[in-house]
């Protein structure tokens, strides 16, 4: 079990981090989405498929141009990650808007401040790079995530909904936004 005091460090992810990122990604989906999406969507997210995905992300594949991935470490162990990149929403300017595509933690560190500080780290870097707005999507019904994002200063945009959850699965997600400047 991880106990997080006030110290978590953040750094860009490397290819060596991919197996742990994939494990956390799968655990995050299990924790956050069980009961909200079809069980088949969860069971098809194998470690092998997640490793393949994260190799593509870190390799800057076509879908992931200009994306960045940061990991959170506690005592040298990766306990979370965040993926961000230019927004592809047609109603925002991608040159000034960053989208947080993923924020997942090892379930053992949830509620200990790591997610908040990792998200702050990503948003601080985006602001320093000239971004003015951040967006992200929350699966409709994921009340824990909605409460978290509201608590850390995000505003819900319930009228902006996407149906794509990834890997060909569709589920409604509502957009959230936060000004960076």
Where are these regions (language model features)?
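Conserved beta-strand-loop-alpha-helix junction that forms the acyl-donor binding cleft
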Residues: 136-146, 162-168
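Conserved GNAT acetyl-CoA-binding A-motif
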Residues: 126-138
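A secondary-structure capping/hinge motif
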Residues: 152-159
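Short hydrophobic/aromatic beta-strand or adjacent loop that forms the aromatic wall/cage
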Residues: 67, 170-175
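Acetyl-CoA-dependent GNAT
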Residues: 3-8, 12-16, 26-35, 41-108, ...
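Conserved glycine-rich acetyl-CoA-binding loop
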Residues: 93, 102-120, 129, 140-147, ...
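Hydrophobic pocket/interface hotspot
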Residues: 21, 25
């Amino acid at each position: 079990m991880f106990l997080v005091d006030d110290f978590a460090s953040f750094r860009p992810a490397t290819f060596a981090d991919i197996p742990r990122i994939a494990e956390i990604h799968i655990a995050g989906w299990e924790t956050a989405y069980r009961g909200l999406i079809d069980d088949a969507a969860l069971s098809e997210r194998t470690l092998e498929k997640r490793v393949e995905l994260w190799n593509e992300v870190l390799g800057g594949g076509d879908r992931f141009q200009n994306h960045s991935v940061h990991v959170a470490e506690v005592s040298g162990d990766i306990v979370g990650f965040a993926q961000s990149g230019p927004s592809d929403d047609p109603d925002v300017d991608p040159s000034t808007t960053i989208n947080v595509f993923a924020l997942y933690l090892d379930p053992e560190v949830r509620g200990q401040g790591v997610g908040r500080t990792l998200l702050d780290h990503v948003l601080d870097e985006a602001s320093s790079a000239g971004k003015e707005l951040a967006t992200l999507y929350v699966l409709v019904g994921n009340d824990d995530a909605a409460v978290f994002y509201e608590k850390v200063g995000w505003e819900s945009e319930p009228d902006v909904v996407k149906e794509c959850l990834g890997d060909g699965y569709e589920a409604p997600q509502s957009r959230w936004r936060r000004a960076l400047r």
